[in-house]
A protein has these predicted regions:
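Extreme N-terminus of proteins, especially the signal/transit-peptide cleavage junction
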Residues: 1-3, 346-347
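N-terminal Rossmann-like or analogous alpha/beta NTP/dinucleotide-binding catalytic cores
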Residues: 2-139, 257, 296-298, 302, ...
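A broad detector of the eukaryotic-type serine/threonine protein kinase catalytic domain
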Residues: 10, 47-48, 144-149, 207, ...
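Short coil/turn segments at secondary-structure junctions
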Residues: 11, 50, 54, 149, ...
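Structured ligand/cofactor/substrate-binding pocket environments in proteins
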Residues: 15-24, 39-40, 45, 54-59, ...
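A short secondary-structure junction signal
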Residues: 109-110, 146, 174, 205
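Conserved nucleotide- and phosphate/pyrophosphate-binding catalytic cores
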Residues: 163-361
């Protein structure tokens, strides 16, 4: 088995710049580099339903939005497999088997689960499906024998659960499943891009997102409201980088080429920072530059999205074909899993003969 990438997103809303810089941009780069044998990218609708069970229409509508975001960002169905999680029933079966290999207390210790439970106010009444989603996520990964999972650093505890389950399964039954490694964003600030308020992770529920599909006017409206950290009385005062969302975003998105085009007074972000902390550069000017950078980056993405929006049936054809291909792969893994667990009753001819001989008079 070769090198395989697997990654995905919950279809609970349009994808934003945090998704793009945190993993989506890297996925496109990895796809185009061709260093991996297979690449799977999926919409985790089953996982999304664990905390949206009473609102399936929300998930249904956002399948289309996320698919458009994937395709507009540059994911190519000729190079990677795009699929919908619920269309692969083998994942539910594997989840059940993996649940037998982990304790409730181990899941409870997962810091990501603790954070998610608190964020959703589930402390007093946790849906079982939500509580068990680390195991479901492990099934998502292992069913496709993924060797690499591009993700943010907040997902490392989840990957560790997967690795533990792989080791436990392979030791208990047979060496069938593969231990995955996480692939973090190369730029540290991209691993957890803050919201426009500078205080929290970018999140739709917090209203601090810039979406990949936002038009130019909407982007500028949001950039103008971004946090600059500690306030200044005038631009002549020294600027502060700590807690300054504008510079965090510039760290993530600016390049020397953008400086040459939009702010030739500076060649690099380091030069701008050096002058900013001395004073003499207004926050409004920095925001205008950031606005130009973001919109320049989003222009081709928005253009591709518009093209795909004109043929939504084809978008669903892509997802249907990808789901069929993904299911075929997962089914092969499950054949190996059942054989390892000795529950391949109908395909094990030797077992049937043995049982026949046992009861033969």
């Amino acid at each position: 088995m070769g090198k395989i990438i697997l990654t995905g997103d919950r279809p609970t809303g349009k994808l934003h710049l945090g998704h793009y810089i945190g993993s989506l941009q890297r996925r496109v780069q990895l796809q185009n580099a061709g260093d991996f044998d297979r690449m799977f990218v999926f919409m985790a609708d089953v996982q999304a339903l664990t905390d949206n069970a009473d609102n399936p229409e929300k998930i249904r509508q956002n399948i289309t939005e996320v698919a458009l975001d994937y395709l507009s960002a540059g994911l190519d169905p000729q190079k990677c497999t795009l699929y919908i999680q619920s269309m692969i029933p083998e994942l539910a079966e594997l989840t059940t088997y993996l649940m037998n290999l982990i304790s409730v207390s181990r899941v409870q210790r997962n810091p990501t689960v603790k954070t998610e439970i608190k964020m959703r106010n589930f402390e007093a009444n946790i849906p079982l499906g939500f509580f068990c989603y680390p195991v479901s996520q492990a099934a998502d990964i292992t069913a496709f024998k993924a060797t690499t999972v591009p993700a943010g650093e907040d997902q490392e505890p989840m990957l560790e659960v997967t690795r533990e389950l792989v080791r436990r399964f392979n030791q208990t039954y047979a060496p069938v499943l593969v231990e995955p490694e996480i692939l973090l964003p190369e730029i540290a600030c991209c691993r957890r891009l803050p919201g426009t308020d500078g205080k929290e992770k970018m999140s739709k529920s917090l209203g601090n997102c810039i979406y990949m599909s936002d038009d130019e006017k909407t982007v500028w409206k949001k950039v103008k409201k971004m946090s600059n950290g500690e306030p200044r009385m005038s631009m002549e005062e020294p600027g502060h980088l700590e807690g300054n969302a504008v510079f965090t975003y510039l760290e993530a998105f600016s390049t020397p080429e953008y400086f040459a085009e939009f702010w030739p007074e500076f060649k690099t972000l380091d030069e701008l920072k050096e002058q900013y902390v001395k004073g003499g550069i207004g926050d409004g000017t920095c925001k205008k530059f950031l606005n130009s950078v973001i919109n320049k980056m989003l222009d081709p993405i928005r253009a591709r999205r518009h093209e795909f929006e004109q043929d939504i049936p084809e978008v669903f054809n892509i997802l249907k074909k990808g789901s069929e291909d993904a299911r075929e792969f997962a089914a092969q893994t499950m054949d190996e899993v059942r054989k390892a667990m000795r529950i391949d009753y109908f395909s094990d001819a030797a077992y049937i003969e043995e049982q026949a001989a046992k009861f033969k008079i």
